[in-house]
Design a protein with these regions (language model features):
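Gram-negative (and chloroplast) outer-membrane scaffold detector with strong preference
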Residues: 54-136, 140
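Predominantly the C-terminal beta-signal and adjacent terminal strand-loop region
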Residues: 133-169
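N-terminal signal peptide c-region/cleavage motif recognized by signal peptidases
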Residues: 3-5
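Short glycine/proline- and aromatic-enriched beta-strand/turn motifs that initiate or cap beta-hairpins
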Residues: 7-57, 169
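Residues that define the transmembrane beta-barrel architecture of outer-membrane proteins
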Residues: 22, 39-43, 79-85, 99, ...
């Protein structure tokens, strides 16, 4: 079978992408939250593909950076470890303005264990949030946001889904 270039434009699922600005980003994230009723810090990062300065498809992942006792587990000297990540979908509102907003949702999975890994559990996570964004330069933006982490399926010692769910800033 021989092929020849077609003279007409080829139809594609996303259409003519040459008319749409797109690029990528990545960066660190620090979140202040609560785990099992105690102050906690999550550190991690997120990145994605920015489509037409309005929509982001990406991913993110976060891990517990503070020490917490593993409630309900009879293992001395072991701390709780937790992490989660997933797909991020984000809508950016008025990205050309000095200060603008975005709204996002992370949908994914996480895990909780002890420092020695003697017990472990996996869970579902959904984390909607909003951010206030500041354009520092054309290629550098800083965001300040709030989110709520919903977890489901947690059965780890005396911890349940409510203990790992919570607001974050």
């Amino acid at each position: 079978v021989l092929g020849a270039p077609a003279l007409a434009d080829e139809n594609t699922l996303l259409g003519d992408m040459s008319e749409i600005d797109h690029g990528g980003f990545g960066g660190p994230v620090v979140k202040f939250t609560q785990v099992d009723g105690a102050f906690a810090v999550l550190s991690g990062g997120k990145g994605g593909w920015i489509i037409d300065h309005r929509f982001v498809v990406g991913g993110g992942g976060y891990g517990l950076a503070t020490r917490h006792k593993a409630k309900g587990l009879e293992v001395s000297g072991q701390d709780l470890e937790m992490g989660y990540g997933g797909l991020i979908l984000e809508a950016i509102i008025a990205s050309d303005q000095l200060i603008h907003f975005s709204t996002e949702v992370l949908i994914g999975a996480g895990g909780v264990t002890t420092t020695r890994g003697s017990e472990e559990d996996a869970f579902f996570v959904a984390e909607p949030g909003v951010s206030l964004m500041l354009n520092i330069t054309k290629f550098f933006r800083m965001g300040f946001g709030a989110s709520y982490r919903y977890t489901a399926g947690v059965n780890f010692g005396d911890l349940d889904s409510g203990d790992l769910s919570g607001g974050a800033a």
